[in-house]
C-alpha cells in the first residue's frame, strides 16, 4: 500500500503570521528603523516555511516523514518496525520536534499521532490528522 499525506499546521501558521504582523507593526511605530523587527520577521518566515506542514510517506520498504520542503527528513525501513499504534498526545508536548517520555515527537498540529517502536527499542511518534490511514499503511507494509 502506497501512502502519502501532508498535514498543514493551520494554528501554527496563524500564530506565526500574527507574530510577523506584530513585528511589522512595531517596526512601523519606530519609523521603520527597527532592525531587530526585520530580523525577527525573517526568522519567523523561515520557521513558517520549514515547519508549516508535515508530510508522511509509506512506500515500498520505507516510512518517511519531513517538515515543509523536506526539512528534517527521517527515513525508516519498514522491516525495522516492531509495532505501531494510534495514540493521543498531551497538549503539553506541543508542536515541532520534541523529546517526550515516549521518545521523539514530530508534529505540526493537533494531538493525534501514530507511535512507532523499532526492533532496536527506539520509539517515536508522528503527529497526523489521519492516524487511521497512516496506521493502516504502516501495518499493511510491515513484513
Please tell me what each predicted stretch does.
Residues 1-31, 105-106, 111-113, 123, ...:
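N-terminal membrane-targeting/pre-transmembrane regions
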Residues 24-27, 61-62, 66, 76, ...:
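Soluble, non-transmembrane catalytic domains of enzymes that act on hydrophobic metabolites at membranes
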Residues 31-40:
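Short, aromatic-rich membrane-interface segments at the entry and exit
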Amino acid at each position: 500500500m502506497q501512502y502519502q499525506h501532508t498535514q498543514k499546521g493551520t494554528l501554527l501558521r496563524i500564530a506565526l503570521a500574527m507574530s510577523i504582523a506584530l513585528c511589522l507593526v512595531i517596526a512601523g511605530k519606530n519609523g521603520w528603523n527597527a532592525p531587530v523587527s526585520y530580523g525577527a520577521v525573517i526568522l519567523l518566515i523561515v520557521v513558517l516555511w520549514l515547519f508549516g506542514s508535515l508530510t508522511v510517506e509509506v512506500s515500498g520498504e520505507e516510512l518517511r516523514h519531513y517538515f515543509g520542503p523536506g526539512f528534517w527528513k527521517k527515513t525508516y525501513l519498514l522491516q525495522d518496525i516492531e509495532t505501531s499504534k494510534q495514540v493521543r498526545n498531551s497538549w503539553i508536548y506541543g508542536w515541532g520536534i520534541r523529546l517526550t517520555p515516549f521518545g521523539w515527537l514530530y508534529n505540526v498540529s493537533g494531538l493525534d499521532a501514530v507511535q512507532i517502536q523499532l526492533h532496536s527499542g527506539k520509539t517515536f511518534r508522528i503527529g497526523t490528522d489521519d492516524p487511521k490511514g497512516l496506521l493502516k499503511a504502516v501495518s499493511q507494509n510491515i513484513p
